[in-house]
């Protein structure tokens, strides 16, 4: 039996402010929200532009991302909005950090979301050293969670790790075991 309440937050994962509003109405609150370029691309405004044959440049995508995040920001609580950088396996820590610095200025409650890769962790460490709030995503193992802890150690701001429980479950692993192990390791 649990004797203390965990410091757990409810964060919406999406890119449509109207969905955030609906959920907030349904449950009465939303602590925060996570976004990423893929979720933003599914936003109805973006989808309408694409359906009309408009191809967005990276700069236009970034501007739309910023507008959407700025609309979501006042709808959520203290856990803020996690804004994921545009990245792939070839994106360097320096490139991610530069994006993160810009994105961190978009809203007052920004958390910059980096992938749990070697380069993503390097970017997160540098971000923390510059006083930025971070959320490390795509965490699939306790070893990765330990690397997140090492990269964010000493931060004065909250730092989040986003374990991918559902994907672990999809491949036949027990995702909840990862959560239990992370909680025990961080305790």
Language model regions located:
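Catalytic alpha/beta core domains of metabolic enzymes, predominantly
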Residues: 118, 135-187
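Conserved catalytic network of the ASCE P-loop NTPase/AAA+ motor domain
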Residues: 132
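Active-site beta->alpha loop and helix N-cap motifs at the rims of alpha/beta catalytic domains
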Residues: 5-22, 26-30, 35-129
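Solvent-exposed alpha-helices and their adjacent loops that cap or buttress functional pockets
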Residues: 2-5, 104-105, 153-154, 187
């Amino acid at each position: 039996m649990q004797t203390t309440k965990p410091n757990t937050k409810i964060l919406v994962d999406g890119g449509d402010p109207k969905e955030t509003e609906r959920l907030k109405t349904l449950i009465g609150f939303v602590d925060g929200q996570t976004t990423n370029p893929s979720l933003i691309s599914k936003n109805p405004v973006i989808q309408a532009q694409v359906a009309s044959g408009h191809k967005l440049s990276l700069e236009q995508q970034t501007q739309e991302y910023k507008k959407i995040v700025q609309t979501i920001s006042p709808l959520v609580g203290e856990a803020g909005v996690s804004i994921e950088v545009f990245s792939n396996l070839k994106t360097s820590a320096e490139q991610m950090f530069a994006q993160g610095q810009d994105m961190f200025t978009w809203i007052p409650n920004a958390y910059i979301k980096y992938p749990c890769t070697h380069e993503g962790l390097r970017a997160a460490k540098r971000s923390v050293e510059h006083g930025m709030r971070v959320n490390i995503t795509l965490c699939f193992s306790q070893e990765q969670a330990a690397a997140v802890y090492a990269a964010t150690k000493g931060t004065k701001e909250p730092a989040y790790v986003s374990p991918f429980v559902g994907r672990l479950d999809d491949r036949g692993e027990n995702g909840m075991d990862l959560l239990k192990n992370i909680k025990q390791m961080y305790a």
